[in-house]
């Protein structure tokens, strides 16, 4: 964070409240649910481990997997997007999954979103295949961002990665970038109508494409996010915007202040995923290492 981006003094109180909530809501198995008292789920568990670097990570080391793919919850199905997030967490925390991180990297490279034939109602290239949320479904923006970023990080850690999978994922994100910049959840245009971009998906898209900063889609999306970051006031949207813009070296003071103001509401609502994301975003001592290439 730039020297001019000093976060307000009440941030320390917000950080303490978020950490206390996550600590008290942790399940006996070491994971976190979306809401206290519920079963542990992969997404909030990953963000909580990223946010609290000193928390025991045994739960993720032992997280159930089938055929190299992590399950979204115990006795559940694989979720490719959260598998990518888990890989980012494993690499950042220097955890070796019981199945081997190499097996998890290989597992996510075996699956891909379903291709669709070109048609007159879509301007995007539906032949591009990246990642879906679940098997036998079409590619979506969020799982593609998590998986592509995880593979880029894995490659930089010396793990075997199919570069063509990463390049096709990048191409899909560029292809689906909205006209004015940013990303919708799936498509940029349907039956001739441009779809709106959203802050969380745009932040994730930028993080995934941070090594492609010369792309016009990235420049347009960065401009869009700077303009629209405060338009979605949820802790999840503000947190992701804060992290993405910070990674790109842009000013984040206004977003950080808005996020701090949102923390009391986040704590009242009790969403542990949002609390973990906010704690990660407001901390600066980790230098966003989990998400930076």
Which role fits each region the language model picked out?
Residues 56-70:
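A short glycine/small-residue-enriched secondary-structure motif
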Residues 1-16, 32-56, 71-109, 113-171, ...:
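An alpha-helical repeat/solenoid feature that recognizes helix-turn-helix modules
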Residues 258-259:
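Protein-protein interaction modules outside structured cores
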Residues 26-28:
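N-terminal capping segment at the start of a domain
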Residues 262:
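Basic- and aromatic-enriched surface patches that contact anionic nucleotides/nucleic acids
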